[in-house]
Amino acid sequence: MRGRQDGDAVDRAGLRLKLLKQQAEAGDIALLFADESEALTHPYLAHAWAKRGADLRVPAPGQSRKLALLGGLDHGAARLIVHRSRTKRSTDFISLLEAIDTHYGPRPGRVSKPAVLVLDNGPIHTSKLTRAALAQRPWLTIEWLPKYAPELNDIERSWRDLKRHFLAHQTFSSVEQLDAAVALAVDHLNHERGSHLCHDQRIAA
């Protein structure tokens, strides 16, 4: 992946993101990192403890099915917003934008701060349909990442945490069961991060 990167573009993007993170941590902007992932009905295999020489087996009957996860990570609040879908299309990404509207969009009586959405150049982010939806949200500034630089997108760590700590070594009998498990996992992850953030803020005060 690194061999295909434009090193200068990655360095410049990294510096811009560093400044944006400082603004978000100061409370001046809302900074969101967005991207997609997927969860499977078959087990996600993470690190596990076992006796030396033991043969660990996780049952995985039938054919694995997928659930698309389209998410936005709020850098300042450490909150993960996830839209779950059977598909990963522009219309699904627009559903994520609508969820972001709920939390960050202008609304009567709400004091809104500038919002920045960090995106890669994936096809559902750059489609005609998505670009039209983004144009309808002038309050949302897009920070485009350079190609082949997933390490700049902080949401990737959240996807790993979600799967490793809440979905690992489990088999789900249906997509519906998986969907419910992911919804619960996102709630738990946000609760944990919110508790840690409050604790850190009390220490800083």
Residue locations for each model-derived region?
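Mobile genetic element proteins and their domesticated derivatives, centered on retroelements
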Residues: 33-35, 71-72, 78, 97, ...
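Conserved short alpha-helical interface segments
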Residues: 1-4, 37-39
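The start of beta-strands in P-loop NTPase/AAA+ ATPase cores
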Residues: 30, 115-116, 141
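Short, aromatic/basic amphipathic alpha-helical patches
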Residues: 127-137
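Extended, low-complexity cationic-aromatic segments
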Residues: 9-99, 199-204
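C-terminal anion-handling pockets and recognition modules
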Residues: 28-29, 155-205
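Acidic/histidine-rich, metal-coordinating catalytic segments
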Residues: 97, 109-126, 148, 153
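RNase H-like polynucleotidyl transferase catalytic core
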Residues: 55-62, 138-157, 171
